[in-house]
Amino acid sequence: MWCLLLVAFIVVANGHDFKTIYSWNYVDFDFPNESIRDSLISSGHYIPENNMPLGLQSWNDKFFITIPRWKNGVVSNLNYISKNDQSQSPKLIPYPNWETNCIDFPGSIVSIFRTKVDACDRLWGVDTGVTDILGNATVVQPVRIFVFDLKTDKVLRVYTLKDSDQTSNSFFADAVVDVDPNNCDNAHIYISDLSGYGIVVYSWAKNDSWRITHNYFHFDPLHGDYNISGYNFQWTDGVFGLSLSTPRNDGYKTLYFHAMSGITEFSVSTEVLQDATLKRSSDYHTFHVEGKKGARSQGPTSLIDTKTGIDYFTQVSKNGIACWDTSVPLDEDSFVLVAQDNTTLVFPQDISIDPLFNMLYVLSDNLPQLMFSNYDPKTRNFFLTAADLDSLTPACKKQNSKSR
């Protein structure tokens, strides 16, 4: 059924407009029964208006959606909905189960922001271990990497980051997985430390991690002022969005990265990141400036369509999605805003690609409303939208007549 629904969507999608797949006034869960739901609300363990969807990942017939514990009252952090669900506002189902998401259980998941699925059908997530982030922030667990087998819904590995991987200011909200589909043990995850200004690398084969530092990981003080949804605020978030190219001739990939509070895109070879023994001071010039994206082009996440080499970016100051064809130099002309909507794309948080149906999905959640006020449960606050990549590609390439 979900295949037919997606095919039908592709047929009717016009231009490069994003169509709403699901939307929510507030997030509800697939509780065992109404009595349990009512009890959790009465006790304050479930406060509907404090549950804000943030991370999105598409895999087969599921969308994985995270609910970070920004405030108290979040009953499950890692969840999914079925693409077979034809309701307007599907209830979220805890993944892999309720127990793993119960904050009172030993070893449970606390607060994963974004997840990634690799070519070996594994779901990766970095758990910050912090609850009530916007209130009385409390460290419940150390920072850990969770890896799930999506074929069995079992936890494959939990790895705790070392003290040397972090600073006193560290916070991890995004990552990208680099894996050889022909050798699943040859896998690395690159994790951006937005407030400690670094990248942590974890090797699956070595079961070890190390930290990379560079000046390019810092925020740009000229681009930390935001005006979104009527709220003015300042952020000092550094390196955040990460996207990977396809393999180059030497077998390695290019990692593109940018600060949340910044408009410059940078890059580095994964060969540099994967070598834990290199002297970082002598490798300064192995990092490169790709170019500037233009005014108000800040955004958390990015993702490369490996079929076309086009990098897609969330644009929080423009309520939109932009793109850049990585085969040409990056500048304000080659950085193209392909979608903008002041209702369905307000603060686009995460993006995901379904390679089977060639779709780009976006989850938007109007984060400033949670930070500085409260969501109105009588209005649509969260949107999962989608566009056919075939309709986006011409718009992304039409400006790009130059070649590298």
Regions found by a protein language model. Give the residues of each.
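Beta-rich, blade/repeat-based domains predominating
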Residues: Y46-N60, D104-V126, S164-I189, F219-T254, ...
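Short loop/turn segments immediately following the C-termini of beta-strands
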Residues: P68-W70, T128, S192-G196, W204, ...
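Blade-level signature of beta-propeller repeat domains, shared across WD40, Kelch, NHL, RCC1
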Residues: D350-R404
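Surface-exposed loop and turn segments in beta-propeller and other repeat-based domains
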Residues: N25-H45, Q88-G107, K154-S170, S209-Q234, ...
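Beta-propeller blade signature
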Residues: S76-Q86, V140-D153, Y202, D376-L392
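Short loop/turn segments immediately following beta-strands, especially the blade-tip
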Residues: S82-S87, K151, W204-W210, S267-R280, ...
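Blade-loop segments of beta-propeller domains
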Residues: M52, I81-D132, T138, R157-D163
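Beta-strand-rich domains and repeat architectures in extracellular enzymes and scaffolds
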Residues: I21-S76, F113-R114
